[in-house]
């Protein structure tokens, strides 16, 4: 998926996330995350790496950084994003297996683990991961139907 497919997947993911959030009150790890993960839904290794970094970010911020700093609101969100970005960059540096097709998604992919970790802090792990995978799969399925026509 290149070019306009990126925009279509992100807009579709945001739309599905917004509808789902309005209906259920459950936020699927931020509005842009399901659209982004739908772009790599057929690459389970990449999805697992993003989820692993997200959980690691949550653990570091909740049980590490918050012991030394008072974190709430914007400070907590900023700490989560910075930790997620640093872990993603460190992981990319230490484990540089990145297929060419998803290279262009690295920019937005740096933010996604922090967004997922921030939502895990608010809603819990099972609810966040479950709804995110559900909506990513729905976005992926709709994009595949879009490709047929």
Curated annotation (Swiss-Prot):
Induction of synthesis: Capsule synthesis is transcriptionally regulated by AtxA, AcpA and AcpB.
Keywords of this entry: Capsule biogenesis/degradation, Cell membrane, Membrane, Plasmid, Transmembrane, Transmembrane helix, Virulence
Residues that span the membrane, as ranges: 1-21, 24-44, 45-65, 129-149
Lineage of origin: Bacteria, Bacillati, Bacillota, Bacilli, Bacillales
Gene name per UniProt: capC
Function field: Essential for the synthesis of the polyglutamate capsule of B.anthracis which is one of the principal virulence factors during anthrax infection. May form a polyglutamyl synthetase complex together with proteins CapA and CapB. CapC may be the endogenous acceptor of glutamyl residues.
Pfam name, any one: Caps_synth_CapC
Pathway info: Capsule biogenesis; capsule polysaccharide biosynthesis
The protein's name in its UniProt record: Capsule biosynthesis protein CapC
NCBIfam families, A to Z: poly_gGlu_PgsC
Biological processes per GO annotation: capsule polysaccharide biosynthetic process
Subcellular location as annotated: Cell membrane
Membrane topology recorded in Swiss-Prot or TrEMBL: Multi-pass membrane protein
A GO CC term assigned to this protein in UniProt: plasma membrane
Superkingdom field: Bacteria
């Amino acid at each position: 998926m290149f070019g306009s497919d990126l925009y279509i997947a992100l807009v579709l993911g945001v739309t599905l996330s917004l509808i789902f959030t309005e209906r259920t009150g459950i936020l699927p790890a931020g509005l842009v995350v399901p659209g982004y993960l739908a772009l790599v839904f057929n690459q389970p290794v990449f999805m697992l790496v993003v989820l692993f970094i997200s959980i690691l970010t949550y653990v570091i911020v909740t049980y590490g950084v918050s012991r030394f700093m008072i974190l709430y609101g914007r400070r907590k969100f900023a700490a989560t994003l910075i930790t997620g970005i640093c872990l993603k960059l460190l992981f990319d540096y230490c484990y540089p297996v990145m297929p060419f097709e998803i290279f262009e998604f690295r920019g937005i992919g740096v933010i996604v683990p922090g967004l997922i970790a921030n939502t895990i802090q608010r809603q819990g792990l099972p609810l966040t991961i479950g709804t995110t995978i559900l909506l990513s799969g729905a976005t992926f399925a709709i994009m595949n139907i879009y490709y047929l026509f």
